[in-house]
Amino acid sequence: MKRNAFEELRVQLRTLKWLGVLRFTIDFNKCLVRENASEERSAWLYLIGVVGITCSLIVYSTYFPSHFIMGKHNTTGNCYALINIRSCSIVTMLIYTQLYIQRFRFVALLQSILRFNQISGSHREEGRFAFYYYTHLSLLIICMLNYAYGYWTAGVRLTTIPIYLLQYGFSYLFLGQVVVLFACIQQILLSILKYYNQVVLKNIKSSKESREFYYNFCKYNQVIWLSYTEINHCFGLLLLLVTGLILLITPSGPFYLVSTIFEGRFRQNWQFSLMSFTAILWSLPWIVLLVLAMGRNDVQKEANKTAKMLTKVPRTGTGLDRMIEKFLLKNLRQKPILTAYGFFALDKSTLFKLFTAIFTYMVILVQFKEMENSTKSINKF
């Protein structure tokens, strides 16, 4: 018996709906995505609530920065921590706002993928999707326990620790589910592309022009358009903001390790070992999100396979030739398919560059810390 289209994403979509985004009704049997008045009101109330809470946190951290100070950190580290939590609040608010503004575009995107997924019967990814989902939730629990212990040990006020945990916990849950949805949709598109690749290849091997080949190639063009245009419009700016936030937050763990532990603030062996482990785990959940968003570029590879096949198609002097040439020129030869709003490609090479940037950023922070220590030493004389 054929399974319902898009059934693999039920849990992810319901989680995002519970978080107040992508609030619409999905009929998995009829491949329909609808938004009604009550769902729109709920989405609006969620947005108002998130904007109000995040703005309140930003104002509170601005007027009472001393409440967020870590007693065992230096001035550079405390300034960096304030920048991080404010940036996290701003990015969360911006992404919530964008998802609300673009909700109709997401409706169209999901409905199109629903239809293609039902046609191709691509239902082989539920195990991988469940792995993505539960890995993210497991990392959320680890992240919160680690943050709670880390802030308590660092000397943060007990009344401020829940604020840190609420902001980072909610942001990691929300942003992580958006990244998981993007990764899952990317895998679904990959399965659909593989299906149409096989169909088009079978048509090519038949060595004859047919309506079936023209029809399948048109469908393939639509899938590429979804991958190249609609996915980038829906997720491009979101991933750009998420990447920037991760790039900002990730050095916090290693920087805390350098600025506290290696300066002898935790002298006992068990304290040193435990805080080293805490610092290592501090940035791990965010790095996993970065890898999940950019660790695979199989959609681009599958599209390139199609390009190689289409170059072997004999030219007939018909409109199909122009269609193939336009496809090769526009969609494959000029730029990558998946990008963060055109700023950079979402692939492994970009992932490596981002890790290099994170390391460079951490070195700069350490240099600021050393300058601060040198200034303090000079002032003593």
UniProtKB/Swiss-Prot annotation:
Its main location: membrane. This is Gustatory and pheromone receptor 39a, isoform D. One of its GO terms (biological process) is sensory perception of taste. Glycans are attached at residues 74, 373. Keywords: Cell membrane, Glycoprotein, Membrane, Receptor, Transducer, Transmembrane, Transmembrane helix. Residues 65-78, 150-172, 256-273, 372-381 are extracellular. Belongs to the insect chemoreceptor superfamily. Gustatory receptor (GR) family. Gr21a subfamily. Gustatory receptor which mediates acceptance or avoidance behavior, depending on its substrates. Plays a role in sustaining courtship behavior in males, possibly through the reception of a stimulating arrestant pheromone. The gene is Gr39a. It is found in: Cell membrane. GO terms for molecular function: taste receptor activity. It is a multi-pass membrane protein. Residues 1-43, 102-128, 194-234, 295-350 are cytoplasmic. The keyword DNA repair does not apply. GO terms for cellular component: axon; dendrite; membrane; neuronal cell body; plasma membrane. InterPro entries: 7TM_chemorcpt. Expressed in the adult labellar chemosensory neurons and adult thorax and abdomen. The chain crosses the membrane at residues 44-64, 79-101, 129-149, 173-193, 235-255, 274-294, 351-371. It comes from Drosophila melanogaster. Disruption phenotype: Leads to reduced courtship levels toward females.
